[in-house]
């Protein structure tokens, strides 16, 4: 099978010439056999290209612009399709060719063609999401534990402060009671001293009475 690339060598459009050079240069660099067909100097080539490009790939005026790529009689695509296939590393599938053995393109195409590739990717994504959720849950639990311990330590400090205040209040009351006891003791001793003085005054009066009797 031979790849056919329809180009316009005498095109006045710089954009078209750049696209043609990119396609041809890529095929040459990757040693892909192809045949370059000029539609500018060969009316048969131009007619064949226009007739074999699918209708959905033709512009509104019905005249497809080069470069157009075919694999023998089968249409491969235009430059935009070629560029997308090159970026996705599926250029050999785009051209309808078997990739050379051991090439990077072969591995990427095999991976993209696996039926369970999407499922495996989804499973890996789900596993990663589960691990992240578990880690976030552990972090939240640790935060809650630290908050609980902080509240307990605060409550313990408050209790200790209240206990200290209570002890100080009791000591103050004991001191006040001791002061009251001292004052009451002094008042009780004062009447006793007064009574003793009165008794001493009565004794001289009695002695005076005895003198008069004698």
UniProtKB/Swiss-Prot annotation:
Q: Where is this region: Disordered?
A: 101-214
Give the range the annotation lists for the signal sequence.
none
**InterPro entries per record:** Glut_rich_SH3-bd, SH3BGR, Thioredoxin-like_sf
Motif SH3-binding: where in chain: 61-67
Q: Which UniProt keywords apply?
A: SH3-binding
Q: Which Pfam families match?
A: SH3BGR
Acidic residues bias: start-end ranges? 162-192, 198-214
Cite the record's Basic and acidic residues compositional bias ranges: 129-144
**Chain ranges passing through the membrane:** none
MF terms in GO: SH3 domain binding
Question: Which family, according to the similarity comment?
Answer: Belongs to the SH3BGR family.
Q: What is this protein called?
A: SH3 domain-binding glutamic acid-rich protein
Quick one: which gene encodes this? Sh3bgr
